[in-house]
Amino acid sequence: MARYLGPKLKLTRREGTDLFLKSGVRAIDSKCKLEAAPGQHGARKARLSEYGVQLREKQKVRRTYGVLEKQFRNYYKDAARLKGNTGENLLTLLETRLDNVVYRMGFGATRAEARQLVSHKSIMVNGRVVNIPSFKVSANDVISVREKSQKQARIKAALEVASQREKPTWVEVDAAKMEGAFKRLPERSDLSADINEQLIVELYSK
């Protein structure tokens, strides 16, 4: 599947918020002027229409999770079929992607790095190698780093970075064993308050 390979901070500046596309070793605002649009001079951002606000929110979430437009729309359709709040269902589906869970557990410093680990067959689910980043993780699944991959410096570095940030309550990780359990589906209160998923629902409902 195609992926955006351009400058990560350009996307961050376009959305005006930290998309967690970089490792988090340094504060994002020390590297990137979030209030300025991309470009050498960072032209002042125009006031957005209602549609523009909805579109920006969708782009922000889509880019945060590293999902392309067609796949993101499919996630929305799946979320709409489920019982409950469509917006919250959408976030839950995105959170159950294997690449995201690998990132949440700290095996990858970014979701892009976690996706690469999965694609390169460095990750196991319940003892079996899975190389599909979009693989849906279920409650109580055990995620581990393949033994032959455990010496990778980037995984050790990622775990060190993860130890410095707040740990998600819905995963349990044994950093020494490079193994973790996806204990439960995250609740809306567990996730970023900076996301307004209702704007995405309104966008796709038109």
From Swiss-Prot:
One of its GO terms (molecular function) is rRNA binding. Keywords: Ribonucleoprotein, Ribosomal protein, RNA-binding, rRNA-binding. The keyword Transcription regulation does not apply. Residues 96-156 form the S4 RNA-binding domain. Belongs to the universal ribosomal protein uS4 family. PANTHER family: 30S 40S RIBOSOMAL PROTEIN (PTHR11831), SMALL RIBOSOMAL SUBUNIT PROTEIN US4M (PTHR11831:SF4). This is Small ribosomal subunit protein uS4. The gene is rpsD.
